[in-house]
Amino acid sequence: MRKKQKSAVENETVYLHTRGVIKDNAVMALLGDKLFRQRVEKKRKGKGSYQRKAKHPGKIFEKPDYKFF
């Protein structure tokens, strides 16, 4: 009896690149893709973390007795 071999391709997710047809060098083509572009991370703590805008704009919680028509 012959054992069935599981292929590794079935479990892997396939990335749909935006480079069209890759002809020569797949690694260099994927490095130029939008997935590997440089991103600026926002500071969460420290000097550059101050945000001028409110976290939840437009959500003002008032007491219901102020709303008389």
UniProtKB/Swiss-Prot annotation:
Domain of life, per the record? Bacteria
Give a GO molecular function annotation for the protein.
rRNA binding
Q: Would the keyword rRNA-binding be found if you checked this record's keyword annotation?
A: yes
Q: Which cystines does this chain contain?
A: none
* InterPro entries the record matches: ArfA (IPR005589)
Q: Which GO terms describe its biological process?
A: regulation of translation; rescue of stalled ribosome
Q: Which residues cross the membrane?
A: none
| Sorted UniProt keywords | RNA-binding, rRNA-binding, Translation regulation
Name the family: Belongs to the alternative ribosome-rescue factor A family.
Q: What does this protein do?
A: Rescues ribosomes stalled at the 3' end of non-stop mRNAs. Recruits release factor 2 (RF2) to the stalled ribosome, helping position it correctly in the ribosomal A site so its GGQ motif can hydrolyze the peptidyl-tRNA bond.
> Subunit arrangement?
Interacts with the 70S ribosome and release factor 2.
Question: What is the name of the protein in this document?
Answer: Alternative ribosome-rescue factor A
Q: Which organism is it from?
A: Haemophilus influenzae (strain ATCC 51907 / DSM 11121 / KW20 / Rd)
